[in-house]
Structure formats: structure tokens, C-alpha cells
Amino acid sequence: MNNPSTTKAPLADYLAHLPLAEEERERLGESASFSELHARLAGAEGAAADAGGDPALASVRARLQLGTPELDDAEMFGVDAQGRTFLKISPPIRRTKVIPEPWRTNILVRGWRRLTGRSNPPKPKRALPRARWQRVGSLRRFILLLLMLAQTSVATYYMKGILPYQGWAFVDLEELAQQSLLDTVQQVLPYVIQFGILALFAILFCWVSAGFWTALMGFWELLTGRDRYRISGSSAGSEPIAADARTAIVMPICNEDVPRVFAGLRATVESMAATGEMERFDFFVLSDTNDPDIAVAEQQAWLELCRETKGFGKIFYRRRRRRVKRKSGNIDDFCRRWGGDYRYMVVMDADSVMSGDCLAKLVRLMEANPEAGIIQTAPKASGMDTLYARMQQFATRVYGPLFTAGLHFWQLGESHYWGHNAIIRMQPFIDHCALAPLPGKGSFAGAILSHDFVEAALMRRAGWGVWIAYDLDGSYEELPPNLLDELKRDRRWCHGNLMNFRLFLVKGMHPVHRAVFLTGVMSYLSAPLWFFFLVLSTALLAVHQLMEPQYFLEPRQLFPIWPQWHPEKAIALFSTTLTLLFLPKLLSVMLIWAKGAKGFGGVIRVTLSMLLEMFFSVLLAPVRMLFHTRFVLAAFLGWSVQWNSPQRDDDATPWSEAIRRHGMQTLLGIAWTLLVAWLNPRFLWWLSPIVGSLILSIPVSVISSRVKLGLRARDEKLFLIPEEYDTPRELRATDEYTYENRWHALKDGFLKAAVDPLLNALACAMGTARHNRAQAIETVRGERIGKAIDKGPEQLDGATRLALLSDPVALSRLHTRVWEEDRDDWLGRWRKAEADDPHAASVPLAQVVPGDAGLLPAAQS
């Protein structure tokens, strides 16, 4: 036992950080040791835990009751098999089998298995009942294919007439074999380059054509409002939700911005409660966080959220200790533990906000459409202040509805799922949508990265519809704040979409979802195709300027084959391509003119914003092209692309990072400009949008990431969106709660979980590694605690921190040793962290009584 004279000082400090009445603080201050203090705090309830040599663990419940008395009223305390207190942060587990079907991606293997009598996976027992919308959808997609092919054929024919070398038919292969290699190269090279240009042009034009017709039909849908196949029209929107139609709203997170995540979740919870349908919904925060400081911040944020919304027993938290299969594995784990308790599941992202009306409407739509497996909303982007993000918000808000409505027009009930802000029918998802790793080795094998498209394809293969409710309000998300953060996300999406293409020929996939896999690939593969198209165009210019033209391509040819140039055809084709690219944007703005532009700043402001956004999109397109080309090559070649961006409070891109990321692009733009100027300066007029963008990439990336410019644009009503003009209640609440959460955001989470009396009690009660007593476990615990004591909080590695955080016994023993031994490396660092935090509670803490607003209700310093 410690000497009382050496214990009093830290003992008084410890008690000062507990919200006690003054008389109780004096009584506990008479304790001769920390063990006695915890025994007095625990009373008879903690005897079992204390008998095991864990005095701090014995007082966990008492300390939590002091800080959060609402826990008792909500019956949140439980006792495990060893008599240790825990919080009921998740419902009782009722396990459901989640078994992924192995992928058979090789059609030759499938054919061999059929020949040898071994069965391939059977077709699903359930078939989607044949409905009129399926016939209509098939007819529409056939028409779309004809339109794309016809448009591409005409454009390719024009392109062929524009290219200078028209004598390929006169090339005699037999003669080529008899002449020198140099003569053959000089004669054939221009035609080979032209063929490559023509092939790439046809592919790229077809891709642009698909987007054009999608936007055009979306414009028609939104203009007329006569979509008889709208999924949102199948429910009146006010019918009561059945008592057994329970819905889990799940939010998978991983090392996220905790104040923003829980602010958005609180706004969603409160909006849901306002509908009067809260009894049908439960909320789950599914954490894959592996940063100990963030994990502790999540625990405290969960407790505060439950207390502020009276959500104990309705809002749950689970942090995985074994992170497998990333987000899809996180969802699988939820389905395996609790999926059988719910009929539906709504998946939200960390930056998602959804209104209660939207959530209730989704459930009603599912109830009204028993053949629907997934209903995807069209989230509206909002909430960002940088110039880049505001331009992207404006673009997605103005142009996005056309493309989303167009997707619905062509796909109907065989549509997309984007992985968040969507409702899923739980049982078929569990039965059919678990994802096995892709077989083989290399960068395109292993756990599937972009799970959403694959899950939609599996849901449709199982006989369930996948719909987009493109006109459903109340669904929101946030966009990356700057170009480099967007590209960081694109790198992951690029690899995931390329992996998904391995499933293109998997048995049973619907043709629409095979097309979805193809379009997912083209979203990124179009970048290297465009880059190679530009490279070949430059190469053709070099051949035309540097090589002596071959006018006579066969013996006894009477008339020369002159290189041709038709500027009128080139201008016509160029104008047509620009029309396909930019007409959808103009149609979007025309639709706003027709329906009212007040929410976008008025007719003049929305038009000016469109023109500015078009200018910036032209500037940024070549930059994205080079990055996406790099991502595609890295995926195919198995390169590991490291991208560790620094943390930035204002989301601005530093000049140093912009130079590092865009420097090679700038040099390429300068070199390309000099080369073309040397070959033929007149060609620079055609290439200037490309090389000019690359040369300016550094300042454009930096300047567009500035918050001040974004706020100034908002003040001028540029890039204004309706969610800013008349902000929905949920978004206003999210901003308010984010500000409040940042004001008292928890820093140095693990340090405080190990030292602070209240946070240690919370972390111990939420620890999930609840082992039985065993000598091997005790040995490992002792090693971890000894390592933590020896190294101190700053030198302790992350893996040991996580292990201690998950083990309530080890964490409580570390807490006890730090205070009993008066460890200055821990206590001194903790006191400094408290002193450096201007929003930390003053000590001594006043006693908390039910109804108080905060966890630490003392006056703020």
C-alpha cells in the first residue's frame, strides 16, 4: 500500500476530476490509497471485480453514474460473466449466416465443369416477375444502343475524312515485304497512327454519346414530369409503417472527422424523431477506426449523442477489432450479428445526412414494392466552403439531376447502387450479396474494393429490383474540399472499378449490370485513351512535318496521293463534340430558368455560374486525365501509389503539396507546348486548352482550394444552390452541431482514456475483449501494461494502444498504476493536455444531476 503522505496530492487531483459534491469529495479524500478510494466509490457492487485485483475496474459503474446519471435510468449497465461492468452499447447478438458464393470468373473453367458433370452455381430460385417496365426498359436500352452506334458511326466517318492520309487502300503488303524496313516504316507509319487515332476517337465519341443521350432523356423526364415508372410514385407517403417493418440505419466509419460525423447523425436522429416513427428505426455507428485517439473520441461522442437525443437503446456503437474486407466487411459483420432483427437497412456514409421524412418514405416505398431489393436516393451535395467544392456542389446540383433521371429512364428497376443513402431489403442482401474475394493473385485479386456496383448486380441476379428514387428529397452528402482530395478518392474508385470488370462474364449477371461494370471501367479508362489519342495526334503532326510524304504507293501509279486537309469538316466535327459535351449543362440551366432560378441566385447568377464552372471544368479536365492515366497504369502494373496528404484544418492545398503533385504535369505541358510550337505553331490553337491547363495546374489547384474565395463567391451568389438559399432544417442542425462539437472536441483520446477518471470508466465499460481468466491472457496483459508504463504515452505504438483500449482489465490496471505510482510521463502529459485545451472543463467538477446538459457540466474556462 502506498504511503499516505505521498498519496494525498495525486489523490486530491484525481477527486478534482470527478463530479462530486463537496462533502463526498472530502469523505473520499480520507482514503489511504487509490485502492481504498475505488473501493469506497464502488461500494458493494464492485467487490467481485476488486477481488480480482482490479480496483479501478470495480469503480467503473460508480464513476459513470457520477458523470452520466442517465445511464441508470436507461438501464444501460450490464455485468459480464466475470462480474465486470459493461455498457449495453449494442443489442444482443442473434447470429445469421452470411456466406459469400465463390466467384467463377473464367468461362473456360465453367464450360469444363459443365462438360465434366460438375455443377456450376444454380440459378436463383426466385425470378423477378415479368412486368411491363422490364419490356419497356429493354426497348429503351436497345434504342439507346442504336442512337449511340449511329451517332458514333457518322462522327467516325467524318473523322476519317478529316485525317490527311487517305491512301491506305493503295498500300501493297506484298511490295512492303520486298522493300527495306526504313522505306516500309516511312510508307506505313502515318496510316498506322491514323488507324489508332480513328479507333480511339470512335471509342471516346461513343462514351460521350452515351452521356449525351442519358442527359437528354433526363431533361425530358424532368421537364414533362410524366414518368409513369417512378418508384417514388408508388407510395402515398403518409401511410403508417407496420410495426414489424423494423429498419436499421447503419453508418460505417473509419478514422473520420468525429465532430462532423456525430453532428450529421444527431441531425438525422432528431429529424427521424420528429416524424413520430422513431420506434421503427435503430441507428448503428459501425466503426473500423484503428487510430486510438479517434476511437476514444468516437466513444465519448456516442455517449454525448445518446444523452442529448435520449437515444440510449436506439443508437448503438460497435468498433471492430478485426478489420477485414473494409467497408463491405463492416456491413457483413453487422448483418451477421444483428441483420436478422431487421427487415430493412439504410446505409449512410460518414458525411451523409438524411431527413426523417426521406427515411420514412424509403421504408414506405419498400413496403409498397415487395419486388424491390434496393432503392437508391440521389444525394444532394452541400456543406462545403472552398471554391473548388462549391463549384462541384453547383455542378452536381444543377447537372446531376439530368443524368440521374436519365439513368433511371434507361435502367428502371435494373439500376445503380452507390453504397450510401439507400435502403436495402435485408434478407436477400444477406442471402445473396455477401462478397467473396476475387480469385488469383495480383492487384486485381483479393477483397473487392468498390462493393456497391457488385452488390446491386447480385441483388438483381437474385431476382430483386434495384431502383433510383431520383426525385426524393431529404438526402444529402458532402464532396471533397479540393482537387487533390478528390483525386485521392478517385484512386481507390479507379482500382475498384477495374477489379469489378473481372465479374463482367460471371454467370447470371443481368446485361444492364454488365454494362454498369463496363461504364465503371470507362469512367477511368477513358482518361488514358484520351491521353493516347492526343499523343498519337501529336505523333501524326510530327510525321507530317518531319517525314517526306509518299505520294506514289504502288508501281505504275499515274496520279499522286496528296495529303488532305478539310478545315470545314474539322470545325463541324469539333463543334458537334462540344455540343455533346456542353449541351447537357445548358439544358440543365434552361430547366432551372423554366422552374425558377431564385434558389440558384437568379437567372443571371446561375447562367454566369454555369459559364465559370464550364471554364474551370475545361481547366481541370486535362489534369484529371493525367492523374487517372497514372492510376490506371498503376493498377495494371501493380504499382503501389502512395498518397499521404497532410491534415489541413481549412482544407486548403499548400503550395508545396501542389508542386509535388502537379510539378511533372507542368513540365509535361511546357515540353509539349515547345514541341508542337517547333513542329507547327498553328496546331497550338487546337492543343492550347490541354497544354495550358497542365501549365496552370499548380496555381489552379491551390487557388481553387481556398475557403475565402468560396465564401466570397457565395456572397456574390455565384455557385449558389437551393440548400444554401433556403437551408433545410437537417443541414442547419448539422452545421450547428458540428460547430458545437468542434468547440469541445476530444484531443489526445487514448492518453485521457488511460488517465482521466471519467473517460477511463467509459473506455473500460465499452471495451469488448472480455476474456475469461487465464494465465496466458494475464501474461500478455502484464507485458502490455509494462510496455505502456516504460515507454510512456508518446512512445507507445498504435497496436498496443488499441489492444489496451479494447481490454477493460488491462486499461483499468494501467489507470491504477499511472495514479498509484504518480507517473509523471503520463500525468504530466495529461495535465498539459488539459491546460492547453481552452475548452476543457474547470476543476474541481461540480456534481452532475439528471437533466444537466453536459458530461462535464462545470463552467468553461
Curated annotation (Swiss-Prot):
Protein location: Cell inner membrane
Ranges in coiled-coil conformation: none
Keyword check for Glycosyltransferase: yes
One of the protein's GO biological processes: glucan biosynthetic process
Pathway(s): Glycan metabolism; osmoregulated periplasmic glucan (OPG) biosynthesis
Primary residence: membrane
Record's bilayer topology term: Multi-pass membrane protein
Pfam families in alphabetical order: Glycos_transf_2
Transmembrane residue ranges: 142-159, 198-220, 521-543, 572-594, 601-623, 683-705
Enzyme Commission number(s) of this protein: 2.4.1.-
GO cellular component, as recorded: plasma membrane
Task performed by this protein: Involved in the biosynthesis of osmoregulated periplasmic glucans (OPGs).
Similarity remark: Belongs to the glycosyltransferase 2 family. OpgH subfamily.
Protein's name according to its UniProt entry: Glucans biosynthesis glucosyltransferase H
Organism: Pseudomonas aeruginosa (strain ATCC 15692 / DSM 22644 / CIP 104116 / JCM 14847 / LMG 12228 / 1C / PRS 101 / PAO1)
Name of encoding gene: opgH
